[in-house]
Swiss-Prot record:
Listed cofactors: Zn(2+)
The protein, known as: Small ribosomal subunit protein uS14B
Provenance organism: Kineococcus radiotolerans (strain ATCC BAA-149 / DSM 14245 / SRS30216)
Binding site for Zn(2+): 24, 27, 40, 43
Family assignment from sequence similarity: Belongs to the universal ribosomal protein uS14 family. Zinc-binding uS14 subfamily.
Amino acid sequence: MAKTALITKAARKPKFKVRGYTRCQRCGRPHAVFRKFGLCRICVREMAHAGELPGVTKSSW
């Protein structure tokens, strides 16, 4: 889990736009965040396997 201070810091509007970054809405992870879902890759995978993300299916070819 992310530190509470870092989550609150990320929620504030940055002084410069380029300093802003995405965080996972579920766990607060700052890396590998899918913009479409607002979740990190780990949370997307867990929620997709549990069937909590509508329209997401496991691919097979």
